[in-house]
Amino acid sequence: MKTFVLFVILLCLTFLSISKSETCPFSQSLVSGASATYYTDPNAGNCGYENLMGPLGPGNLFIAALGPNLYNNGKNCGQCFNISSPYTNRSVVIMATDSCPDSGYCQRSSHFDLSTQAFDVLGAQSIGVLEGLTYYKVPCGVNGNVKIMMKDGSNDYWTAFLIYNSKVTIKDVSVKITGKSTYTSLTQSSYNYWISPNMVPGSFDVRIESVGGEFIYITIPKVESRKQYETSSQFSVDGCVGTPSGPSGGLGSPSTGASIGTPSDASSLTLYALFSLTILFLVMLN
C-alpha cells in the first residue's frame, strides 16, 4: 500500500510540474465590444514589414491596422488575434502589421482596421463598420525561426533592427558591441525598429527577449544595410490555446487549438493532478 501511495504522490508532482511550465507568454483573455472597418491597401504598414507577400511579411493579406490603444506605440506589431463576428458566426486569425491613427473609429479602445480579405470573413463590406466583435490574442504560426534585419541606412556607427517571423511579440532587444562585456537595451520606435545609435566597426551580439521572458542570441559579423539573418531558435508558445499551423501560419482561418472557455493543455494537466490528489486522499482514508 505504501508503494502505491508513493507512486501516486510522484505522479501528482510530475503533472503539477508540467502544468506550471506550460503557460502562454501573454494573456489570452477574451475581449468583447470590439469594432472593425476595412482598408484596401495594407502593404507598407507602420510595423515595417513592407510588402506583405515579401520576405519580411506574413505571406498573406489577413492583417489589421490597430487603433492607438491596441497598437501601443508598436509593441503589438506582429501580434496575432483571433476575431469572432456575430454577423457571420465565424472567426478569423489576423496579424497586426500597421497602425490606424485616424480620428473616429480608430480611437476606440479595441478597433481593427482590417484588410478586405479579413473583413469579408466577419461581415459584408456594405455594413461598413462591424460592431460587437470579440477577440483574443493567439500565437502566430510562422514557419522557421525568428529573423532580424538591419534598417536601410545602417552603418558602422548607427543601425536599427527589425525583428520579425516571431510567434510572439518582442519585449526587448539588446546589443553587446565589440570590446564590451554587457548588453545594452535598445529603444523600440513606433515604427517597430529597435534603435542602436552607438555602434562600432566589427562583430556584435544581439539578444532578443520575448514577452514571455525567453532569450534568443545571434552574433552578427558587421553592420550592413538591409542585411537579413535567421536566428537558430523560435520562441515557445506552450500552454497557449488557438496555436495555428500550416503554410499560411494560420492567418485567415479559425484557430486550430481549444476555444476560449475550454481548458488549455496546461489547465487540463492541472485538473488531472487534482484528480490524482483526490485518489491519494481516498487511498489514505482506507
From Swiss-Prot:
It is a single-pass type I membrane protein. One of its GO terms (cellular component) is membrane. Residues 44-145 form the Expansin-like EG45 domain. SMART domains: DPBB_1 (SM00837). It comes from the Eukaryota. Pfam families: DPBB_1. Residues 22-265 are extracellular. Residues 1-21 form the signal peptide. Coiled coil: none annotated. Keywords: Disulfide bond, Glycoprotein, Membrane, Signal, Transmembrane, Transmembrane helix. It is found in: Membrane. InterPro entries: Expansin/allergen_DPBB_dom (IPR007112), Expansin_CBD_sf (IPR036749), Expansin_CellWall (IPR051477), Expansin_EXLX1-like (IPR049818), RlpA-like_DPBB (IPR009009), RlpA-like_sf (IPR036908). Glycans are attached at N82, N89. NCBIfam families: expansin_EXLX1. May serve to lubricate the movement of the cellulose microfibrils during cell growth and wall extension and/or they may serve to maintain the fluid state of the slug cell wall. This is Expansin-like protein 1. It comes from Dictyostelium discoideum (Social amoeba).
